Every structure is written in C-alpha cells, then in structure tokens.
A protein has these predicted regions:
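Phosphate-binding and adjacent anionic-ligand microenvironments
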Residues: 1-127, 134-138, 145-151, 157-165
Length: 165
C-alpha cells in the first residue's frame, strides 16, 4: 500500500486519498506533526535533530546548468555522453553502480537519465530538463552531520562539473 511520496519542487502525496502533489497536503502533515509533538513538549526542530542523531544527516541538492540554443542542446548531449564514460568516482566517493535509463530499466520507460550510486549511501543523478534548456544534477549525500554532508556534496559537484569541459 502507498504511504508517502514527494518530488523536487516540494509537492507531497500522503496516503492514497490525495491525487495531486501540492503544498496543501504537506502543510496539513506539518500541522499534524506540530500538534502531535507539542503535546509531548517537543518542537519540530528538536525532533529533526533527534532523527539526525539517530540516522545521520541526509543532504539533497539540485544544481541546474543552462545551455541556450541549438549549440547548447548539442553541448548537453555531449555532456550526457561524457557522463556515460568510465567514471570511477565523484568527490572521492567510489561509483558502485551506474544506472542508465536510456533503454528503459526495471520496467521503467526509456529516459535520458543517469544515476550513479556511490559508496557511503550517496548518489548523483544527471538528466536534461524536459521543459527548459538545462542540465540538472541531483545529489544525495548521507553523512554523520550537516557539515560533513556539505563538504562531500561540494566535492561531488566539483567533480561533476569537470565533465562539462
């Protein structure tokens, strides 16, 4: 049964009773959490800190790079091909597996998306935007704390941007 889903632009779906991702459902869930933890004398920030201490810190970022015109489109295609090369690591994190969705994968339709699974539960996803002349890079980093996650994320971004040359 479906429990929870979300997407990059902050749309949320909880349960099977909501049919569209929007901020209303997310706001409702935040109010529910606030009410529940208020009865226990716990703030939402305190609860979030407790979760970080228990499970570690997870940082998710999106970086967009604009490429205008037909030359920009060709450049994006070239960059995607470069990413399909034999990349061993990003930001010092070894590539454990590359998932290339160009031919369909795991029953999903074909899509110009590359997902690099990295060691230490980190990942980087690279794809062209479907609506804008942009290349998007999604980075997910798990670390002990925020500072460590931000440091790893910064190194991954630096390595990824090298492939734009």
């Amino acid at each position: 049964s479906y429990v929870f889903g979300f997407e990059e632009s902050y749309g949320y779906l909880t349960g099977s009773y909501v049919r569209d991702k929007d901020g209303v459902d997310g706001a409702y869930m935040i109010c529910e959490m606030f009410s529940y933890y208020a009865t226990k004398g716990i703030s939402l920030l305190d609860k979030l800190d407790e979760l970080y201490k228990t499970y570690g810190y997870c940082l998710n970022t999106l970086h967009s790079y604009e490429f205008d015109g037909s030359a920009g489109f060709a450049k994006m295609q070239s960059i995607m091909q470069a990413f399909r090369g034999n990349i061993k690591a990003f930001g010092g994190k070894k590539v454990v597996k590359l998932l290339d969705y160009a031919y369909g994968l795991d029953g999903l339709p074909k899509s110009e998306v590359l997902k690099f699974l990295l060691e230490d539960n980190c990942s980087i996803v690279v794809r062209p935007s479907g609506t804008e002349p942009k290349l998007k890079i999604y980075i997910s980093v798990s670390a002990e704390n925020r500072e460590a996650a931000e440091k790893v994320e910064c190194e991954i971004v630096k390595d990824a941007e090298k492939w734009f040359a």
